[in-house]
A protein has these predicted regions:
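Hydrophobic, well-structured mid-protein blocks that either form specific transmembrane helices
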Residues: 93-139
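Glycine- and other small-residue-rich loops at beta-strand/loop junctions that grip anionic moieties
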Residues: 64, 84-88, 108-111, 158, ...
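Conserved beta-strand positions in the central sheet of alpha/beta enzyme cores
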Residues: 54-55, 106-108, 132, 156-157, ...
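Catalytic cores of alpha/beta
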Residues: 83-102, 167-169, 173-176, 180-196
């Protein structure tokens, strides 16, 4: 079935990423340089034909987390495109707040020990279609294959090198995060992947 989907190469989604720290857009999880006005940036994404924005909440405490959720809510009020968010999710209430803030889906972090149990509860309460998982290694998928299929609607792959293994381990759809945009590299990698299917 994935080969059929890949053959519809005209179907592409362009997904932007946004990192929030203290209610402001920053360059990355490791670079806290402010990127300008977060609302203008999201409006630019909205007006540029981006299909979805994935927001990473980089908060380290509850007050900052609330500030970032408030920012996400304001973003969702002012743009038309879909928003998914994750980061600092420690309770079912955090999932609820992000969904109520207008997020289409909530992203859980596979590297966090409590994520699977919490995601399972969130999936049961809010629906599997609202729950995503960010992953960066194949071991997690191998160890939790059945739970992934049952709990998560989609995977956010943070390491492009695991795609081949991912194809053999799960039928769960995925989005690949690419920290740098190089259209030639992306095209070559996807052509190679399609040929393998």
């Amino acid at each position: 079935p994935r080969k059929e989907v890949c053959n519809l190469i005209g179907f592409k989604n362009i997904v932007a990423t946004l990192y929030l720290k203290n209610g402001q857009a920053v360059k990355s999880a490791s670079d806290m340089t402010v990127m300008g006005d977060v609302y203008n940036l999201c409006q630019l994404y909205n007006d540029s034909g981006i299909d979805k924005i994935i927001i990473f909440d980089l908060s380290t405490d509850d007050d900052e987390h609330e500030k970032n959720i408030h920012t996400i809510e304001n973003i969702n009020r002012n743009i038309d495109i879909k928003v998914c968010a994750g980061g600092n999710i420690n309770r079912i209430e955090d999932v609820k707040k992000l969904l109520y803030a207008g997020c289409l889906q909530v992203i859980f972090n596979a590297t966090k020990d409590s994520s699977l149990e919490l995601a399972n509860a969130a999936s049961e309460k809010f629906g599997k279609d609202k729950i995503l998982l960010s992953i960066s290694n194949v071991d997690y998928i191998f160890k939790h294959q059945e739970e992934i299929e049952d709990t998560f609607h989609e995977l956010l792959v943070l390491n492009i090198d695991i795609i081949d293994a991912l194809e053999n381990l799960t039928s769960t759809p995925y989005v690949v995060y690419m920290p740098q945009f190089d259209i030639d590299k992306i095209t070559t990698q996807w052509k190679d992947l399609i040929e393998k299917l």
